[in-house]
Amino acid sequence: MTKTFFELIQVAIGTRICLSQTPSADEWGELYAMAKKQSLVGVCFAGVQRLQQQRQELPEMLYLTWLGMAAKIQQRNEVVDQQCKELWNVLHKAGLDAAVMKGQAIGCYYGELSQLRLSGDIDVWVKGGFDTVNEYIQRTVPSDDIAYHRFHYNVYSDTEVELHHRPTLMRNLFDNKKLQRWCDGVTPDEFIVNRKGFAMPPARFDRIFILTHIYAHFLFSGIGLRQIMDYYFLLKNTSASEDEEMLLKQFRLTRFAGAMMWLLKDKFGLENDKLICDPIEDEGRYLLREVEYSGNFGHSDERFRGFSTLRKMTQRGAHLLWHYPSEVIWTPIWLVYHKFWKREHRNKVYNVRKKFA
């Protein structure tokens, strides 16, 4: 990614007034391609509009293409926001303590750029554990598509929905136990009903949770700048809690957090007083290279194209072992553990489903 692309991002998010030089027509085309790869077409269009006021304009046809894409993103956000509101209200009326996580919830921190963030699926954390979520799902829209932390819940034909009985996980079983204990400590009383009409977790939770989510995708599939930007807006618009430094150490996130802080400070312009820890430049530059390869959730990574899922995971793990050994080394053990976990809990799914057949 070029210096100019990061300048465009900074213009879009308000940490820069204009580009250091006006791009040529070809360079504008490259900027649009980078924005698409990183799933930032909508947010970057806000930068394009601001640059027009500075007389740094792009070719008309590209502008119209970009405008059309941004309009579609806005329309899609309206749909997904409404689905989040509807789903949360249904869960709430059913007596479940639920909060929308990630995606549309994090979008609330984007301010006026909220509707330009590219939406994805809907993730809802339902407190009460596996049995509570399982019984609700089998009673309403039955599903046996389960994992350690979530069910697929096929309630919308055009939007993927996951109901989480755990918000997230770590593959190191000891670290995961600590993480689950910490997640359990977040009470439904802390959930916040936002201006869009659905509940979301408190900022103190999101500041650690979103980092673990990005970390997991970075290790096992890849991340793009959209995920980095989510964390930028979250940190920019929230305040630190007293136990953050301890939690970073406890979950072995200090090195990755340092990499993220370098990237957010150097490339996004996040202020020093908003950083969650000290930046680590070497790790940050390594992270940036991986982001350049991967694109959004690793969809643009050509290095492992055509590999089986297992081989891709093995190759990527070997690639990252030196930097983040704990999660990588624990992966084979985790996969065996998860296989037996799924076997046991799928039986629970079928037993509950029989009750409502």
Regions found by a protein language model. Name each.
Residues M1-G120, W125-A357:
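Conserved NTP-donor binding/palm subdomain of two-metal-ion nucleotidyltransferases/polymerases, i.e.
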